[in-house]
A protein has these predicted regions:
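Hydrophobic alpha-helical membrane-insertion segments, chiefly the h-region
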Residues: 22-31
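Short, Lys/Arg-rich, polar N-terminal cytosolic tail immediately upstream
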Residues: 1-2
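N-terminal Sec-pathway targeting helices
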Residues: 5-20
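Glycan-processing catalytic domains of CAZymes
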Residues: 34-263
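Generic cytosolic/nucleocytoplasmic N-terminal low-complexity/intrinsically disordered segments
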Residues: 7-10, 31-36
Length: 263
């Protein structure tokens, strides 16, 4: 009786110990799985209205686009320590009324920018504007950015004169001398013309970002929708051509439709 009881008492702690070990392994597995999920990064994000208060959020992205005019060199160093690639927004084709330099260059505006009341198209052919953009891009380069996200080359679509084409080209070729990534946002009319003239686009860009390939924006109602098949097919063909030229291709879509997101 005692031996039997002792036998049971001997086995019970061993069984409990094994159970606790299994439970511990299970908990560790769940913790590691949750940690892996927590630190799984998104590929790409564009955050033009953000400032340094969003640094923690940016750590969940492999590559981000920010307006580095509102960040310090130290901010960008912290993002690099996290392994995040940082591109800076740079508007070369329009002038925004909230910039501190607006009053200096407002006289160079050449037309209203539809749907964007705070912006006006700017004369990129003007030497003063080209010099200013050169200085600004130098300052951003010195902050340690990995590349430039160039906006509003579409000024050539708005005003397709030779001087505008040459002005954009001069600005882009100067930025390319930094040896950093140069991503053109949109600008298909200008890029297509450059390719037609020179046969390649690697002298002005390393990548392209295209908005609204699959989605669309109704500015009058402030709602999102699906892009027309005609426009979608046009942009897909354009982007395929860019990719064939060896540049990186990024998409920026505006939608809350899960089915459209999956596309």
């Amino acid at each position: 009786m005692w031996e039997a009881l002792c036998g049971k008492r001997t086995k019970q702690p061993v069984a409990l110990a094994v159970l606790f070990v299994l439970m511990f392994i299970g908990v560790c597995f769940l913790v590691k799985a949750n940690q892996a999920k927590e630190f799984e990064k998104n590929d790409y994000g564009v955050f033009l209205n953000a400032d340094a208060s969003s640094l923690e959020r940016f750590k969940t992205y492999e590559t981000i686009v920010i307006d580095a005019q509102y960040f310090t060199k130290r901010d960008i160093e912290l993002l690099h320590q996290n392994g995040t690639v940082v591109y800076t927004y740079l508007n070369i084709g329009s002038i925004e009324n909230f910039r501190e330099y607006y009053t200096t260059y407002a006289e160079l505006a050449i037309g209203e920018y539809e749907h964007w009341e705070e912006e006006e198209w700017v004369d990129v052919a003007n030497p003063d504007w080209q010099k200013f953009i050169g200085q600004l891009s130098q300052e951003l380069y010195e902050k340690g950015v990995d590349g430039f996200f160039i906006d509003n080359c579409d000024v050539y679509y708005y005003d397709p004169h030779e001087s505008i084409f040459e002005g954009i080209t001069a600005i882009l070729q100067n930025i390319m001398t930094f040896g950093k990534a140069v991503i053109i946002n949109g600008g298909d009319t200008y890029v297509a013309e450059y390719r037609e003239r020179y046969g390649a686009i690697d002298q002005i860009m390393t990548g392209v970002n295209q908005e609204s390939v699959w989605s669309s924006i109704d500015f009058d109602s402030g709602t999102f929708g699906e892009q027309t098949s005609e426009t979608r097919d046009y942009f897909c063909k354009y982007l395929e051509t860019c990719k064939a030229d060896g540049v990186e291709v990024y998409l920026l879509e505006y939608t809350t439709n899960q089915k459209l997101i999956q596309k």
